Amino acid sequence: MRYLSVAEITRLWGISARGVRSYCAQGRVPGAFLTGKTWSIPADARKPTRLNGRRVAPTPLLARLREEMSARTSGGIYHKVQVELTYNSSHMEGSRLTRDQTRLIFETSTISPQGEGVRVDHIISHAGEALSESLLKDLHRTLKASTSDSGRDWFAVGDYKLLPNEVGGRETTAPENVAREVRGLISSYEANRAPTLEDIVSFHVSFERIHPFQDGNGRVGRLVMFKECLRHGIVPFVIGDDTKFFYYRGLSRWDVERGWLMGTCLSAQDSFKGWLDYYRIPYSG
């Protein structure tokens, strides 16, 4: 995909650079992502239409995350989320980086344009958007671009899997059926205008069982849960590496005992509430 700068989009859309950045920061330009303080915008992106009536204001948490992301603030909740999401999710997939090493990566900005920080920025920027296939694929593309997998023709970075895969010894959806099942899952989920935490977790379970991408499904799925909590005003959570046994067991036993996974997520949510209390960010629930 070809990306354009804010200046180039300004000329195409006929609006100010400030207006372009505002649309991007509000998550209204699908596929746009922030690297440092520079927006990269898909060349085929369409100018968002004006919103009529009053807009729903972002929660205090989302507003703070976007403010600190824009300013690249260190030491606040944005920095905390970057480090904890990256450290825990990567460790669950086999990374050996320590938490201090992960923190140092962000504090010294030693990350690539397609690195961990971009993925966290992506879900913050697009938190207000409805779920879509393109959003899931964009998230997978930012996850896998610039990795060894991106050089493999059969891997399909940013697209659905070409080869069958399994998770935890369990068969997943066949490649030829993935698009249909993902569309059905999204359609069913989006029909609920006020999803609960359990609805979001249930979507995650179904997504993991489809396992639409060749690899990276767990990380994409956990980022989507975080995004959806932000979107619907629910306190988000980070699944800790130290609770991955309960998380994976909860995924496998969801049909017979939802308490395993819900308990793990609620415990993680309580920990996140502790961070919000520390940073003096109000929340509901």
Pin down the residues of each PLM region.
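FIC/Doc superfamily catalytic core
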Residues: M1-V29, F33-G285
